[in-house]
């Protein structure tokens, strides 16, 4: 795999994880 592909995949994963955490936190509170 290319390093750029890995970096892009990691960025997408972190963004999705952060977004889900924010939504879950707001709905939870």
Curated annotation (Swiss-Prot):
Keywords: Chloroplast, Electron transport, Membrane, Photosynthesis, Plastid, Thylakoid, Transmembrane, Transmembrane helix, Transport. It comes from the Eukaryota. Its main location: plastid. InterPro entries: Cytochr_b6-f_cplx_su8_sf, Cytochrome_b6-f_cplx_su8. The keyword Plastid applies. It is found in: Plastid, Chloroplast thylakoid membrane. The keyword Mitochondrion does not apply. One of its GO terms (cellular component) is cytochrome b6f complex. Component of the cytochrome b6-f complex, which mediates electron transfer between photosystem II (PSII) and photosystem I (PSI), cyclic electron flow around PSI, and state transitions. The 4 large subunits of the cytochrome b6-f complex are cytochrome b6, subunit IV (17 kDa polypeptide, PetD), cytochrome f and the Rieske protein, while the 4 small subunits are PetG, PetL, PetM and PetN. The complex functions as a dimer. This is Cytochrome b6-f complex subunit 8. It comes from Adiantum capillus-veneris (Maidenhair fern).
